[in-house]
Amino acid sequence: MHEVRVLAFQKIYSIDINQSAMDDIFDIFNIEDKGLDIENESIKSFYSSLVNGTFNNLEHIDSLIRDISWNWSLDRMDKVDLAILRMGVYSLKFQNFENSKRAVIDDAILIAKKYGSKNSCKFINGILDALLKNMEN
């Protein structure tokens, strides 16, 4: 499902950067062009869950990021990093991935390697790992 996470990250980033509405979360990115079957309900549902869930829980997600990222305000964070973090926090906190929470973090790191800056991976790993440890305690 890495490809679906990449598309969801791109949509989350696009909505944030363009300050656009979420009227149709499938409007900007043609999932079929990415080799994914949009008619597959599990793919469509997972994508929708990531995008809608992230924005529906944005206040809580941002609060968690602020609590963990000590000296970083959300305004100072790179928008790519913030989009990856928001989606990662949503997945860890609200989706049922009991056996694969580490995989959520690994996926976020892979996305950061491709789309983020040279320090994005460490930054994102640190915050998501701290959140996971807090959740386990």
From Swiss-Prot:
Keywords attached to this entry: RNA-binding, Transcription, Transcription antitermination, Transcription regulation
GO cellular component: cytosol
InterPro entries registered for this protein in UniProt: NusB-like_sf, NusB_fam, NusB_RsmB_TIM44
Listed GO biological process terms: DNA-templated transcription termination; transcription antitermination
Annotated TM spans: none
Pfam families tied to this protein: NusB
CDD domains: Terminator_NusB
Family under the similarity heading: Belongs to the NusB family.
Function of the protein: Involved in transcription antitermination. Required for transcription of ribosomal RNA (rRNA) genes. Binds specifically to the boxA antiterminator sequence of the ribosomal RNA (rrn) operons.
Protein name: Transcription antitermination protein NusB
